[in-house]
Curated annotation (Swiss-Prot):
Residues 99-109 are annotated as: Flexible loop. Transmembrane segments: none annotated. It catalyses: L-methionine + ATP + H2O = S-adenosyl-L-methionine + phosphate + diphosphate. It comes from the Bacteria. Binds 2 divalent ions per subunit. Binds 1 potassium ion per subunit. It comes from Kosmotoga olearia (strain ATCC BAA-1733 / DSM 21960 / TBF 19.5.1). Pathway: Amino-acid biosynthesis; S-adenosyl-L-methionine biosynthesis; S-adenosyl-L-methionine from L-methionine: step 1/1. This is S-adenosylmethionine synthase. Pfam families: S-AdoMet_synt_C, S-AdoMet_synt_M, S-AdoMet_synt_N. The gene is metK.
Length: 394
């Protein structure tokens, strides 16, 4: 029997980096709502008393960026200066240029299209080079690794008890971390839980610990999942009053492991938020998850990792890899062949298949882009299962 521990973390919507992600995606959604063809690459920085939005945009839409920034920050819960940040009074600075014409050359007309390609999906070239990964497993209902599922659920619950005033005195910033014991590739139980929550200065450490255990941890982690001798750390520094952008500068794209699989598989390095779907950093990651999830749901493997790579301005991927980690129920060579036949990984085909030119991104800018069962997103659908099964006469 092989045993090991694996740990993943999540953060609340009030974490500075997540504020930035949500602002960037709120701006993207507003532009896509008016102009689905918008080209958007928007980065956000939040710091003490200020939010800065910069990037490259080509769109027919008119968007009141400062208002979107403020509304997003207020919705998260930064509504009073004593919380360290106030969406109504913070300064908002913007610096927006149009998309580089050199990049647009390759995105507007791919290398294949320039070489007289007549296929409609050859028109759009990848918006950048890079490699993207997708993963799915049958170990949880979400088809995600258990550590990241629990970490997200704890972070989301932390926000819920604050927003619904189940607990008084919690503030928006917070982090969670979960360590799970695995045995022969299967999760056995939870070994360690870490929860840190920003709080009112009048609250005592003992009070915070009791409230977190009662209203957050018990509500998320079933008792039978907790191993004997489980360690629980609540605000282990002993104080977390100063939080949010007043304590740490937040930037778009700094929580890419939280956004994906909690470190379970490799990551190509590209962030999601603030990017329209011509950016394969976003769309190809979503497609890789969609394909992996359908493979596992079809019973072709217990868990699977995909890697796709692109060259800027070229529609077809330059490489494709599939690894079932020894859990495949069919020949791996045939599985790769079938996947390439059933799914089209060119950017225009991905955008069309998943209907990505819509304002659907802010809702996944916190608590993970994958394994979401609380919102409906196209890359989590299981509508390719039957086609995959037919290919293997199942």
């Amino acid at each position: 029997m092989k045993k090991w521990l694996f740990t993943s973390e999540s953060v609340t919507e009030g974490h500075p980096d997540k504020i930035a992600d949500q602002v960037s995606d709120a701006i993207l959604d507003a532009m896509l709502e008016q102009d689905p063809e918008s080209r958007v690459a928007v980065e956000t920085l939040v710091a003490t008393g200020v939010a800065v939005v910069a990037g490259e945009v080509t769109t027919k839409a008119y968007v009141d960026i400062p208002r979107i920034v403020r509304d997003t920050i207020l919705e998260i819960g930064y509504t009073r200066a004593k919380f360290g940040f106030d969406g109504e009074t913070c300064a908002v600075l913007t610096s927006i240029d149009e998309q580089s014409p050199d990049i647009a050359l390759g995105v507007n007309k791919s290398l294949e299209a320039k070489n007289d390609g007549k296929d409609k999906y050859d028109i759009i070239g990848a918006g950048d080079q890079g490699m993207m990964f997708g993963y799915a497993t049958n170990e949880t209902e979400e088809m995600m690794p258990l550590p990241i599922v629990l970490a997200h659920n704890l972070a989301r619950r932390l926000a819920t008890v604050r927003k619904e005033r189940i607990v008084e005195g919690f503030r928006p910033d917070g982090k969670t971390q979960v360590t799970v014991l695995y045995e022969d590739g299967k999760p056995i139980g939870v070994k360690t839980i870490v929860v840190s929550t920003q709080h009112d200065p009048a609250m005592t450490q003992e009070e915070i610990e009791q409230l977190v255990k009662e209203h957050v941890i018990k509500a998320v982690v079933p008792e039978e999942m907790m191993l004997d001798g489980i360690e629980t750390f609540v605000n282990p520094t002993g104080r977390f009053v100063k939080g949010g952008p007043a304590a740490d500068t937040g930037l778009t794209g700094r929580k890419i492991i939280v956004d994906t699989y909690g470190g379970w598989i490799p990551h190509g390095g590209g962030a999601f938020s603030g990017k329209d779907p011509t950016k394969v950093d976003r769309s190809a990651h979503y497609m890789a998850r969609y394909v992996a999830k359908n493979i596992v749901a079809a019973g072709l493997a217990d868990r699977v990792t995909l890697q796709i790579a692109y060259a800027i301005g070229v529609a077809h991927p330059v490489s494709f890899m599939i690894d079932a980690h020894g859990t495949e129920k069919v020949a791996l060579e045939k599985l790769e062949k079938v996947v390439k036949e059933v799914f089209d990984f060119r950017p225009a085909a991905i955008i069309d298949k998943l209907n990505l030119r819509r304002p659907i991104y802010k809702q996944v800018a916190a608590y993970g882009h994958f394994g979401r069962i609380d919102v409906e997103v196209p890359w989590e659908k299981l509508d390719a299962v039957d086609e995959l099964k037919r290919a293997f006469n199942m």
